[in-house]
Structure formats: structure tokens, C-alpha cells
Amino acid sequence: METRWLHITSENFPALCDAAKGVCVIPMGCVEKHGLHLPLGTDILEASWITYEASKIEPFCVFPDFTFGDVPENYSELPAGSITLPVETEMLLLEQLCEQIARNGFKKIVIYNGHGGNNPWLTTFLRKVENKPHDYVVCVAMMPLVAPHKMAEIIDEQGKEAVPEMNEEDIALVK
């Protein structure tokens, strides 16, 4: 069964909601420079790919990508191609999207975050959502950058300084 929101017809939408048991996952990332060799969309491309692949194992609805992550730099100094919005705008947009997701029958919403810079405002967002009455719940899952057993192996072989190198690039290469 197709699990991606944008790829399903309106007629088949209720069946997706049933098959997903009311669970919808929002892949989240950002658009920013990732060194000289990775694409600007590395975070969101990885989160989106992982989310879709996981939905093939355990059915849930995959919402369209939320690409507007926080890039905490001076707007005038952002590298070419980077996109960032004020956190207040991101929070309002995400809250409205959650309302629409719930209106469509998905009462369990998971934000699968692929960008560490989103963590501070997502914590505030969750607190805000929890303090309002809703007929849905929202939680955040952060994309792990390195499998724990792999991290331990790297530390044993190369020292703890090598661990920061095992991150987005490795996931991009696996994909």
C-alpha cells in the first residue's frame, strides 16, 4: 500500500488512515550548506528517505517534507542556497499542519527530525502543543547520526575525535 500522503488518492485516503492506525510521520530537516560535497537538502533528504523506507516495514502515513529548519546564523551571512525562517513562523506553520493532519484522521503525529538545529525550538513547540487541548498527540524523534555499536567501534579504533566525522555524510552515502 502507498503510504505517502501526496501519492494517494482522496478515495484511498481513509484506507491509509486505517492501515496506519492513525499514525502520521512528518519528515523534518532544513536546507543549508553541508560541506563542499553534500547537497543543501542533506538533512531533509535523509529524514524523508528513512521515513519512507520505515513505512514499508510498519505502515504509517508519510506527510510531505517539512524543509524549513532553523539555521541559527545571521541571515545576511547564510551560504548560498540556504533557507531559514523565523522560529515563530516555523512553529505556527507546524502547529497548523498538525491541526490539518489530525482533521484528516491521524491523531498520533510523529515529527522525525533530521536537523539538530531544530531541537531547541521543537522542545518549545511540544510544550506549547501540550498546553492546549487537542484531539491528537505529537512527539519528536531525532534521527540518530551513528549507530551506537558503530560509534563504540570507531572510538576504540580512532579515538573519540573521529566520532563527529561519522554523521550526515555516512547516512548520505548509505542512501
Protein language model regions, located:
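Short glycine-enriched loops at secondary-structure junctions
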Residues: 60, 64-69
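Short catalytic helix/loop segments, enriched in acidic residues and glycine
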Residues: 43-55
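Fold-independent oxyanion-binding glycine-rich loops
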Residues: 28, 65-66, 143
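Active-site and ligand/interface coordination hotspots across diverse enzymes
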Residues: 1-39
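Active-site histidine-anchored catalytic micro-motif
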Residues: 3-8, 69-174
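Glycine-rich loop at the start of a catalytic domain that most often binds anionic cofactors/ligands
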Residues: 37-44, 75-79
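A generic structural signal for alpha->beta connector loops
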Residues: 22, 57-60, 135-137
